[in-house]
Design a protein with these regions (language model features):
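Short coil/turn segments at secondary-structure boundaries
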Residues: 29-32, 39-44, 52-56, 103-108, ...
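A penicillin-recognizing enzyme superfamily signal
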Residues: 15, 82-267
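Mid-domain, small-residue-enriched loop/turn segments at the edges of structured enzyme/sensor domains
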Residues: 1, 33-89
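Thr-Gly-centered strand-to-loop micro-motif
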Residues: 27, 78, 161-163
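Conserved catalytic neighborhood of penicillin-recognizing serine enzymes
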Residues: 1-37, 71, 113-138, 142-143
Length: 354
């Protein structure tokens, strides 16, 4: 179940992350598999099999009844024993650091009164994903402060991050980063019976206040631009396939070279002139103020319903076939005349996307 009521139709993974769409997170995990996901959790420091005292992940071998090896826990978070803010922040820092994970440390060095270094811990690091993948994730997460977490925005420095809440808003998270630092905030109680207020953006607001203090005096800065191994393509928001640039229903999206789509979407659309007063096709007497130009997407084959009756509205609601019977007085032409401007055979607004 998503946090919102209703159905929003087909959503890209970018939209799903920005809008916290739970269903698509679960579907993605289902596609890649539990074992593959576990490998990435290990890489990002969220599972530590070498140190049981530092590992909060519960495997199926540890507990058959209560474990984290399921679609709910691994896709949506809020694991059986939870995850510490330190670990979560360390994982996000790897995205900020071009895919390189730096093991969190509490100090950089200890010196005596003469400046001699007494202690200087070695900070372990490893590559957990490519810098190209890290760039795309940074770019996607830049959309969150513009949508769900506006309290985290900074006036001159770019911010990427992600909100997080648990059932009944018992926990509120925001973990994010700038070109300078990665910060994690969590608001909640040790007693899980205590609920927070309905303001699920409170952690983002707190994060924004802390971030502004930390960045005080820092010059304006944006994230590094994409490398030459990143390309941008205009793709359909419905299928993810290529579309002609400038046609409706598409967005520009980044891809790692070699992973971009090569086929064009087979959907096409027709623009119909609709009489806003009754939802029927406008006739030759319909005044401009009553006309709405409405785009209908047509699929090569009929939409097939799944387990529910939910479907993308464009796919199941075909354009109207009846002509409006309302005749506007300053034009006496028969609205059902063969020369009606909405006759499909004469429609000049077809835009085939091949």
């Amino acid at each position: 179940k998503n946090w919102y009521n209703g159905y929003r139709g087909l959503q890209t993974l970018r939209q799903s992350l920005v809008q916290s769409i739970n269903v698509n997170a679960v579907k993605t995990l289902e596609d890649i598999g539990i074992e593959k996901s576990k490998e990435y959790l290990k890489r990002f420091g969220l599972i530590n099999e070498e140190n049981e005292l530092d590992d909060t992940y519960v495997s199926r071998s540890e507990s058959v009844d209560y474990n984290d090896e399921n679609l709910s826990s691994m896709a949506l978070g809020a694991m059986t024993r939870g995850i510490t803010n330190l670990k979560m922040t360390g994982a996000y820092a790897a995205i900020a650091n071009d895919g390189k994970y730096l093991e969190p440390i509490s100090f950089t060095k200890v010196v005596d009164s003469t400046g001699k270094v007494i202690l200087e811990p070695e900070q372990k690091q490893r590559e957990v994903t490519s810098k190209e993948n890290a760039f795309i994730m940074r770019d996607i997460l830049k959309g969150v402060p513009d949508a769900m977490a506006q309290g985290a925005k900074h006036p001159t420095i770019e911010v990427s991050g992600k909100t997080g809440t648990t059932s009944d808003i018992r926990d509120s998270w925001f973990v994010g980063f700038t070109p300078y630092y990665t910060i994690g905030t969590w608001i909640g109680f040790d007693n899980q019976n205590i609920e927070l207020s309905n303001n699920n953006s409170m952690a983002a607001t707190l994060w924004g206040k802390v971030n502004k203090i930390v960045l005080e005096g820092k010059p304006a800065k944006k994230f590094d631009p994409p490398s030459e191994n990143i390309i941008k393509k205009y793709v359909s928001i419905r299928s993810g396939l290529l579309m002609p640039e400038g046609s409706g229903g598409g967005i520009y999206e980044y891809f790692v070279k070699g992973t971009e789509p090569t086929k064009y979407e087979e959907l096409y659309y027709i623009i119909y002139q609709i009489d806003k007063r009754n939802g029927k096709l406008a006739n030759t007497t319909t005044k401009d103020k009553y006309i709405e130009n409405k785009k209908y997407y047509i699929k090569p084959e009929a939409y097939k319903k799944g387990k529910t009756d939910y479907a993308q509205e464009d796919f199941v609601n075909p354009p109207p076939t009846e002509v409006s019977e309302i005749i506007d007085s300053d034009n006496s032409q028969n609205p059902n005349d063969d020369n009606n401007s909405n006759n499909n055979s004469n429609n000049n607004n077809n835009n085939n996307e091949e």
